[in-house]
Regions:
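Conserved N-terminal segment of class I S-adenosyl-L-methionine
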Residues: 1-84, 99-105, 111, 132-144, ...
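A conserved beta-strand element that flanks and buttresses the S-adenosyl-L-methionine
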Residues: 88
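Hydrophobic adenine-recognition pocket in adenosine-nucleotide-binding enzymes
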Residues: 92-95
């Protein structure tokens, strides 16, 4: 299933040459670590991993003994998306070409074993593509994104941020455990 056009992939590769591009996961790593450890997860799939800053920061924070599966079309050496207990998709959705958004959501649905941690900006990016477009190709409000996710995911938690929101999702087949 195609998730990116060849032309846009080339634009993304050139953006990834900038050392300051793809750093959003660094500040979110403490939240990812807390979620990971509190749920006794064993694996993380980093969808849109870029330079693997999430993995590097989790290791610096002391998270050990976890399987890490990076995926990013700009880094074909990472391979295909892999299923994991926790699938992180940080600062990715807003960069997806609109015509491939449903394919990306389907990809994520297929690899989430337990939970998905999505961080999405709802404002324009500070960076522009070589062709002059804003790096955020999809700039929509939180409710637009949530309505898109509701047919595929169970929304467990939503947190608004300064530039967008973070959402914790489960596949729609998820059943909430009884409260003790």
């Amino acid at each position: 299933m195609k998730t990116i056009s060849e032309g846009y992939l080339n634009l993304q590769k050139s953006l990834h040459e900038n050392e300051n591009y793809g750093t959003a996961s660094i500040s979110l790593a403490p939240s990812v670590k807390k979620l990971f450890t509190s749920n006794n997860f064993k694996s993380i799939s980093d969808y849109g991993a870029g330079k693997k800053n999430l993995q590097k920061t989790l290791l610096k924070l002391g998270l050990k003994d976890f399987k890490y599966f990076p995926f990013d079309p700009a880094y074909p050496e990472y391979g295909l998306p892999e299923p994991a207990d926790l699938v992180c998709c940080i600062d990715v959705f807003e960069h997806v070409e609109p015509e491939y958004l449903h394919n990306v959501i389907a990809d994520l649905k297929d690899i989430i074993i337990n939970a998905g941690f999505f961080s999405i900006a709802t404002i324009p990016a500070r960076k522009t593509l070589r062709d002059g477009r804003n790096a955020h190709l999809i700039i929509k409000p939180t409710n637009w994104w949530l309505s898109l996710f509701l047919s595929t995911f169970y929304i467990e938690h939503l947190q608004q941020t300064e530039s967008g929101f973070i959402v914790l999702v489960r596949n729609n087949s998820y059943v909430m455990p009884p409260k003790s």
